């Protein structure tokens, strides 16, 4: 969970990518969510401090190709739009990293 790892990095002084590197050969999927210092739940995508592009690039380097996003239902009647917005946010982070280079 790169969001939780980001908060842990503030506590322990080890970057998220260093932490991910320590799992080399043992990671096959990643959990994507937003966090802010000391808060781990119900943070809308794009409003926190999770370093998506940098971390997704590292995960790609480590062979990770499966990702799951964490979506929170907070009682909003427009929850379907919240899910669409979150999915679009994550696609906009994942797609450029995994985009094929064509000549």
Give the predicted meaning of each segment:
Residues 25-28, 62-67:
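Short, well-ordered coil/turn segments that N-cap beta-strands
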Residues 68-72:
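Short acidic/histidine-rich active-site segments
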Residues 55-64, 93-100:
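A structural motif corresponding to the C-terminal end of an alpha-helix
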Residues 4, 74-75:
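Solvent-exposed loop/turn segments at secondary-structure junctions
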Residues 15-19, 23, 51-58, 82-90:
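A general structural detector for well-ordered alpha-helical segments in enzyme core domains, enriched
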């Amino acid at each position: 969970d790169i969001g939780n790892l980001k908060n842990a990095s503030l506590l322990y002084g080890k970057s998220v990518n260093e932490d991910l590197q320590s799992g080399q050969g043992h990671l096959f999927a990643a959990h994507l969510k937003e966090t802010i210092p000391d808060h781990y739940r119900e943070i809308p995508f794009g409003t926190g401090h999770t370093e998506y592009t940098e971390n997704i690039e590292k995960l790609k380097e480590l062979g990770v190709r499966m990702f799951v996003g964490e979506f929170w239902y907070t009682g909003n009647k427009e929850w379907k739009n919240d899910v669409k917005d979150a999915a679009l946010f994550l696609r906009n982070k994942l797609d450029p990293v995994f985009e094929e280079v064509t000549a």
